C-alpha cells in the first residue's frame, strides 16, 4: 500500500500531514464562502475562453452521481466521508514517514472533510470551477474535489512505484 522509504524519524510525525489537510479544508471553505457571497445560484462568469466561475450545488457525489435521488444520499455520502477520514487518519499515523503516500492521504483527507462540511451545513456540496474546451464540458467542481483527485493520482503513482521495486 505504501512505499517502505521513511523520511521522518518517527511514526508519530503525522501532524504535518494533518496540517496540510487542515490548510486544504480552510482554502476550500474560504473559496466556497466567497463564491456564495459573490454569485447567485446558477450565475456564471467567464474567466478565460475555457474556464468559468459558476455557483452550482451538487447533492450527489462526483459528476453528480445520485444527485437526483430523494435525499438519502446526503447522509450516505456524509457517513462515507467521515468513515474515510477516520481510516485515512489511521493510515497517516501508521505510515507517517512515507512521504508520497502521506501527501496523497493528506490531500484526500482535506478534500473529504471539505465536502463533508458542505453536506452537513447545506445538504449539498458547493461547486464553482467550470472547465470547458470546444464541445467538451467537465462537470463543475471545487478545491476539495481537486485535492481528492490529485491525492488519488499520487496514491496510484506511489503504489505503482512500490510494486515496481
Swiss-Prot record:
Its placement in the membrane is given as: Multi-pass membrane protein
What pathway annotation does it carry? Protein modification; lipoprotein biosynthesis (signal peptide cleavage)
Enzyme Commission no: 3.4.23.36
Q: Name one Pfam family in it.
A: Peptidase_A8
Reactions listed under catalytic activity: Release of signal peptides from bacterial membrane prolipoproteins. Hydrolyzes -Xaa-Yaa-Zaa-|-(S,diacylglyceryl)Cys-, in which Xaa is hydrophobic (preferably Leu), and Yaa (Ala or Ser) and Zaa (Gly or Ala) have small, neutral side chains
Tell me one GO molecular function of this protein: aspartic-type endopeptidase activity
Do the record's keywords include Protease?
A: yes
Keyword Lipid biosynthesis listed: no
What are the entry keywords? Aspartyl protease, Cell inner membrane, Cell membrane, Hydrolase, Membrane, Protease, Transmembrane, Transmembrane helix
* Membrane-crossing residue ranges in chain numbering: 7-27, 46-66, 72-92, 100-120, 136-156
Q: Which GO biological process annotations does it have?
A: proteolysis
Mind naming one GO cellular-component term on file for this protein? Answer: plasma membrane
Report the superkingdom from the record. Bacteria
PROSITE patterns documented for this protein: SPASE_II
Active site feature:
127, 145
The subcellular location is: Cell inner membrane
Q: Which InterPro entries match?
A: Peptidase_A8
Q: NCBIfam families, alphabetically?
A: lspA
Give the function comment from the record: This protein specifically catalyzes the removal of signal peptides from prolipoproteins.
Q: Which family does it belong to?
A: Belongs to the peptidase A8 family.
> Per its record, how is this protein called by name?
Lipoprotein signal peptidase
Gene symbol of the encoding locus: lspA
Amino acid at each position: 500500500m505504501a512505499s517502505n522509504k521513511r523520511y521522518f524519524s518517527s511514526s508519530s510525525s503525522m501532524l504535518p500531514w494533518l496540517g496540510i489537510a487542515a490548510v486544504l479544508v480552510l482554502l476550500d471553505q474560504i473559496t466556497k464562502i466567497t463564491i456564495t457571497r459573490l454569485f447567485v445560484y446558477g450565475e456564471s462568469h467567464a474567466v478565460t475562453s475555457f474556464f468559468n466561475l459558476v455557483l452550482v450545488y451538487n447533492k450527489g457525489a462526483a459528476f453528480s452521481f445520485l444527485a437526483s435521488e430523494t435525499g438519502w444520499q446526503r447522509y450516505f455520502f456524509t457517513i462515507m466521508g467521515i468513515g474515510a477520514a477516520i481510516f485515512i487518519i489511521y493510515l497517516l499515523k501508521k505510515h507517517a514517514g512515507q512521504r508520497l503516500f502521506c501527501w496523497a492521504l493528506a490531500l484526500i483527507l482535506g478534500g473529504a472533510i471539505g465536502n463533508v462540511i458542505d453536506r452537513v451545513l447545506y445538504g449539498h456540496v458547493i461547486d464553482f470551477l467550470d472547465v470547458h474546451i470546444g464541445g467538451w464540458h467537465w462537470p463543475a467542481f471545487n478545491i476539495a474535489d481537486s485535492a481528492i483527485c490529485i491525492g488519488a493520482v499520487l496514491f496510484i503513482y506511489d503504489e505503482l512505484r512500490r510494486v515496481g521495486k
